[in-house]
């Protein structure tokens, strides 16, 4: 699927990045600063959240060890100082970006500098990372001829179809005034449809589909200049999509600029990232500042699996105060809970990986619009998805790592972090509730508390008035107390 934005003519003569070091002063945008907050993740037009700028420091490590990372050349305070095309500036203005966020101040000069350098960025959701790598992609593409407009030059990969669609929406909004820009999606399609040849300048997709399309020659990658991996820790983890990403990269030009962004980088993944993106500049939020703010973390004791379900039904009225996501471990559990709750007259929808892509699209769009307020999901939604109305996340099943040769059950800390990050997004207030029904789940919950040095408060299910009071007060409290610390990696 391709999207073309027919608007006024853009300058010709190669990519914008070729002109960054000597910007034409006549190209300075006169677009007035908009009123309102900056946005990241999904733009406001797609139901996304505002940018959240907590107090944090950005640490820069340059690949050139002789260079000074504090040099003013590696920081920028205004988008106009980057020599950006006025049409891109106009797109930024439409997204309510008045000035670069802290991460953008440091990332954009490094991304846009010539010759292009690889970048590895660790930055939590809501700090402007999506806009940063999209802006770089828009600036690198050459749209001077019709042939180049139909030639893939930038590739953005995401772990799921849902996140890829969200990023594609950001590209469309930011690039809406750029003449000749064509955007293509390389995501799983319904079983009865065949992928068409991609004739576009920027491609957003998932690694498996991109790899298949390159092999079938419906995606010709030989002119690609930029490769971006969002949620890169998951994309490069050998337990996840690592093999697919390696195969895709092997099919791309060797001199391609590689950009990796993620909220978390476990040590073993960070070591591999340095090989995937060699000689990269690195940008990191300082360790102690990696927090999820405004999330009240609670847990409920349940007698057994059936009591979990009855507890969930009891919570239904609270789940619909805003929008809520119920995370389960398996597709079968999602389907069974949806079946039972629907049969009892509750309105819920489920989203799992095996559903046809068109059905998944319809469900997530329905959830964004608020037509469905309770969504049951597997980890397909745990990363990156930005829906501004989500006020509660239920960990029906505590996320765990499957380690066949390791005794006992091990909590998956990073998935927990990403799951609860779906609520309380970018300064909003949210609630996370974990269900505990046996000793092993209790031990995993304790592992999470120890790892993140946080307290998860027990709520007594014998007094549902108290449960309701605690949750409603938290959701309505505009100054919820952040209690979630940064973790160990």
Curated annotation (Swiss-Prot):
Residues binding ATP: 123-130
InterPro entries named among the record's database cross-references: DEAD/DEAH_box_helicase_dom, Helicase_ATP-bd, Helicase_C-like, P-loop_NTPase, RNA-helicase_DEAD-box_CS, RNA_helicase_DEAD_Q_motif
Domain Helicase ATP-binding per the UniProt entry, residue ranges: 110-283
Any one GO biological process: tRNA export from nucleus
Pfam families to which the protein is assigned, alphabetical: DEAD (PF00270), Helicase_C (PF00271)
Chief localisation class: cytoplasm
Location of the region described as Disordered in the Swiss-Prot/TrEMBL record: 1-51
PROSITE patterns on file: DEAD_ATP_HELICASE (PS00039), HELICASE_ATP_BIND_1 (PS51192), HELICASE_CTER (PS51194), Q_MOTIF (PS51195)
Ranges spanned by the short sequence motif DEAD box, renumbered to the chain: 230-233
UniProt subcellular location: Cytoplasm; Nucleus, Nuclear pore complex; Nucleus membrane
The enzyme's E.C. designation: 3.6.4.13
Catalysed reactions, as listed in the record: ATP + H2O = ADP + phosphate + H(+)
Matches recorded under SMART domains: DEXDc, HELICc
Topology versus the membrane: Peripheral membrane protein
Molecular functions (GO terms): ATP binding; ATP hydrolysis activity; inositol hexakisphosphate binding; mRNA binding; RNA helicase activity
Record GO cellular component, one term: nucleus
Short sequence motif named Q motif, residue ranges: 77-105
Entry domain remark: The Q motif is unique to and characteristic of the DEAD box family of RNA helicases and controls ATP binding and hydrolysis.
Subunit (UniProt): Associates with the nuclear pore complex.
General function of this protein: ATP-dependent RNA helicase associated with the nuclear pore complex and essential for mRNA export from the nucleus. May participate in a terminal step of mRNA export through the removal of proteins that accompany mRNA through the nucleopore complex. May also be involved in early transcription.
Family statement: Belongs to the DEAD box helicase family. DDX19/DBP5 subfamily.
The protein's name in its UniProt record: ATP-dependent RNA helicase dbp5
Organism whose genome encodes this protein: Aspergillus fumigatus (strain ATCC MYA-4609 / CBS 101355 / FGSC A1100 / Af293)
């Amino acid at each position: 699927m391709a999207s073309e934005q027919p608007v006024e003519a853009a300058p010709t003569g190669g990519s914008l990045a070729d002109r960054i070091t000597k910007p034409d002063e006549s190209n300075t945008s006169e677009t007035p600063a908009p009123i309102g907050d900056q946005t990241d993740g999904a733009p406001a037009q797609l139901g996304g959240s505002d940018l959240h700028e907590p107090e944090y420091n950005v640490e820069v490590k340059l690949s050139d060890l002789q260079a000074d990372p504090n040099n003013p050349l590696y920081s920028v305070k205004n988008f106009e100082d980057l020599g950006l095309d006025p049409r891109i500036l106009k797109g930024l203005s439409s997204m309510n970006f008045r000035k670069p966020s802290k991460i953008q101040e440091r990332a954009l000069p490094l991304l846009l500098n010539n010759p292009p350098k690889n970048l590895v960025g660790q930055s939590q959701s809501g700090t402007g990372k999506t806009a940063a790598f999209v802006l770089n992609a828009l600036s690198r593409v050459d749209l001077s001829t019709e042939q180049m407009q139909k030639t893939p030059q930038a590739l953005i990969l995401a772990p799921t179809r849902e996140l890829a669609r969200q990023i594609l929406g950001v590209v469309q909004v930011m690039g809406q005034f750029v003449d000749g820009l064509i955007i293509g999606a390389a995501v799983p399609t319904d079983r009865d449809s065949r992928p068409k040849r991609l004739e576009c300048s920027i491609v957003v997709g998932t690694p498996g589909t991109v790899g298949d399309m390159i092999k079938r020659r419906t995606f010709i990658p030989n002119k690609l200049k930029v490769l971006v991996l969002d949620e890169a820790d998951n994309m490069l983890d050998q337990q996840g999509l690592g093999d697919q990403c390696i195969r895709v990269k092997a099919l791309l030009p060797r001199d391609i600029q590689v950009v990796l962004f993620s909220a978390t980088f476990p040590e073993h993944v960070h070591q591999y990232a340095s090989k995937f993106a060699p000689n990269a500049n690195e940008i990191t939020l300082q360790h102690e500042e990696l927090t999820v703010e405004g999330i009240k973390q609670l847990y409920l004791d349940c007698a057994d699996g059936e009591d979990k379900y009855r507890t969930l039904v009891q919570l239904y009225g609270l789940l619909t105060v805003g929008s809520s996501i119920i995370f389960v471990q398996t597709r079968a559990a999602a389907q069974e809970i949806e079946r039972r709750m629907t049969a009892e007259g509750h309105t819920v929808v489920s989203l799992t990986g095996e559903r046809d892509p068109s059905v998944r699209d319809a469900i997530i769009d329905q959830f964004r619009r608020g037509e469905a307020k309770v969504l049951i999901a597997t980890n397909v939604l745990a990363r990156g998805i930005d829906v501004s109305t989500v006020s509660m996340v239920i960990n029906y099943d505590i996320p765990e790592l499957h380690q066949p040769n390791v005794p006992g059950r091990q909590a998956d800390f990073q998935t927990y972090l990403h799951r609860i990050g779906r609520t309380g997004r970018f300064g909003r207030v949210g609630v996370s509730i974990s269900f505990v029904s046996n000793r092993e789940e209790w031990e995993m919950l304790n592992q999470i508390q120890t790892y993140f040095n946080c307290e998860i408060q027990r709520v007594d299910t014998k007094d549902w008035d108290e449960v309701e009071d605690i949750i409603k007060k938290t959701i309505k409290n505009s100054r919820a107390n952040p209690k979630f610390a940064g973790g160990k990696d």
